[in-house]
């Protein structure tokens, strides 16, 4: 589906276009009492979006669906509503990320391909932060920590004068390592459960 939406974006606007309010972009990329506005925005999302969602019935239902949709259905979990809310929140947060990227570039004339590099990085960040690709585990705090780790890796590549072209290779290696650790943990749990059968 990502490729479909990418194609639609290119069809709607093959050439960059648009503008952004300079003063607003300046504010969103500035600091308040030496704290970056972007960091305040992350804290606001965690406090006012993630924590209420995590403690709500539909939030817990999303975790149950991630662990086992069939078991969640048999337990009477409202699967359809939980999925709709999860996807709506994902779209809302992706829109905020897109706006922040627009503010960072000080231009609404961004190309459709501008955010393509963030796809792998965002997946790597949440996996490093403890979110399981198999579902049922993860947190906003862990994902933020994973994003800081990814940013640190990127900065270290610059410090050690490594070719930026090789950055996706290192990101891929980190992601592979993180996924492998998660898979090993699940394999250990499965083996322990098999012992009691």
Locate predicted features.
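Alpha-helical transmembrane segments of integral membrane proteins
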Residues: 37-41, 82-89, 141-142, 167-170
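Membrane-helix/interface signature in polytopic inner-membrane proteins
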Residues: 48-88
